[in-house]
Amino acid sequence: DISDKYIETINEKTWIRDDIKPYELFLKTLYEYFKEEINEDKNYDWDEILPDGFMNLQYQTDAVIQAKKILDAYNGVFISDVVGLGKTFICAMLAQKLKGRKLVICPPVLKDYWERTLQQFDVQAKVESLGKLDSILEDNDLMKNIKYVFIDEAHRFRNEKTESFQKLHEICYNKKVVLVTATPQNNFSSDIANQIYLFQPKNNSTIIPNNKNIERFFGKLDGRLKKLEKGTVEYTETLKDNSEIIRDKVLRNIMIRRTRKEIMEYYKDDLEKQGLKFPNLENPEKIIYSFDDNIEQVFNHTICKI
């Protein structure tokens, strides 16, 4: 039997009450779902953390909090904001919050930039170029003690059949991985899948509920494309459909990606604080080129080969 005291408690001390409107219940549901991120933001004094001269921008601090949550849940996260939104700064702020030894792997031309940025944010980390994977593997102390691996331009490792991918996979084994790229996928689903395999087991994944075999999931999507002729309408439509499935089933759980349009819509105050305006892109205009006979012949031959 249900006691009167139990009924009284339900009616007066919970959200299951007649005077609670559906919209209020909806807001309460949102709060309960996102309260970790909301409360986490209150725990950080970003102005104390940021180096002198760096602005406290909400779109960057939000990304740090979300990235840490994803990293803890799945052992890896994609930071894939479009170009120009400060992915390196977001990574440096994230690294501040992570306890444990860190390794940054980046293109040689960006090595000095990464080292300067991490120094500005008072982050201790080993920075190595993409061409030094062998040196990393040979450093037993480093390999034993690394807890986090940051990979800049991670899209370079889309092909698991390459030697560099195999070396990187060995480096990342049993580590938490941060993949930094604005272009994680090119054409095939395997582009994104191979990068995910750097931090998730193929046959024991935790990303898709009730579907541990993520290799089979991506294999089915790639199989749909391989049956079609590249360049056809059906191929293009299938490619779009595959991308939507991947976004809905996989990337929404492990990727942070904001476009300039989204920043303008949801973080307008940040843009005003920076005095930043994104350029308005005009519609493309057709430009006709004229070649002499020899160049035109070479051009046409090249197009046919492509």
Which residue stretches match the model-derived regions?
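PAPS/PAP-binding and catalytic site of the sulfotransferase fold
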Residues: 92, 187-199, 251
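Inter-lobe coupling linker of SF2 helicases/translocases
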Residues: 130-145, 153-157, 161-174, 179, ...
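ATP-dependent helicase/translocase motor core
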Residues: 1-82, 89-97
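Conserved Walker A/P-loop ATP-binding site and its immediately adjacent core
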Residues: 90-93, 99-119, 186-190
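Catalytic acidic motif of RecA-like/P-loop NTPases
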Residues: 84, 155-158, 183-185
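Short glycine-/polar-rich loops that comprise or flank the Walker A/P-loop
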Residues: 99-101, 146, 173-176, 190, ...
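Conserved helicase/translocase P-loop NTPase motor core
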Residues: 55-76, 121-144
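Conserved helix-turn-beta segment of the N-terminal RecA-like "Helicase ATP-binding" lobe
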Residues: 109-127, 199-203
